[in-house]
């Protein structure tokens, strides 16, 4: 079978970077972010967060091949705002939102457990 071993989908190899950034020469003020060992789950949530930013003109992602465990996110921004800054802000906002979700989830579980006991 041609499928790679399962561990290759989540373990970084020695010297392999999690994220690489390349300038997109086809359009102005754009970058390609390649994120290794990730899939549609992370790609879609980052793309959605990027599109909430009014200074982001375009955000999209693709998985080059089903057997390659990486995503490529393309971001184009207004001239006075860098794609790297947009990407960093999107990640920071996502971390905040997910932390709040976790906190609310824990409180709901605690409330439910106290109601049962």
UniProtKB/Swiss-Prot annotation:
HAMAP family: RNApol_arch_Rpo11. GO terms for biological process: transcription by RNA polymerase II. InterPro entries: RBP11, RBP11-like, RBP11-like_dimer, RNA_pol_Rpb11_13-16kDa_CS, Rpo11-like. Belongs to the archaeal Rpo11/eukaryotic RPB11/RPC19 RNA polymerase subunit family. Transmembrane segments: none annotated. The modification N-acetylmethionine is found at residue 1. PROSITE patterns: RNA_POL_L_13KD. Keywords: Acetylation, DNA-directed RNA polymerase, Nucleus, Transcription. GO terms for cellular component: nucleus; RNA polymerase II, core complex. The keyword Nucleotidyltransferase does not apply. Its main location: nucleus. This is DNA-directed RNA polymerase II subunit RPB11. Component of the RNA polymerase II (Pol II) core complex consisting of 12 subunits: a ten-subunit catalytic core composed of POLR2A/RPB1, POLR2B/RPB2, POLR2C/RPB3, POLR2I/RPB9, POLR2J/RPB11, POLR2E/RPABC1, POLR2F/RPABC2, POLR2H/RPABC3, POLR2K/RPABC4 and POLR2L/RPABC5 and a mobile stalk composed of two subunits POLR2D/RPB4 and POLR2G/RPB7, protruding from the core and functioning primarily in transcription initiation. Part of Pol II(G) complex, in which Pol II core associates with an additional subunit POLR2M; unlike conventional Pol II, Pol II(G) functions as a transcriptional repressor. DNA-dependent RNA polymerase catalyzes the transcription of DNA into RNA using the four ribonucleoside triphosphates as substrates. Component of RNA polymerase II which synthesizes mRNA precursors and many functional non-coding RNAs. Pol II is the central component of the basal RNA polymerase II transcription machinery. It is composed of mobile elements that move relative to each other. POLR2J/RPB11 is part of the core element with the central large cleft. GO terms for molecular function: DNA binding; DNA-directed RNA polymerase activity; protein dimerization activity. It is found in: Nucleus.
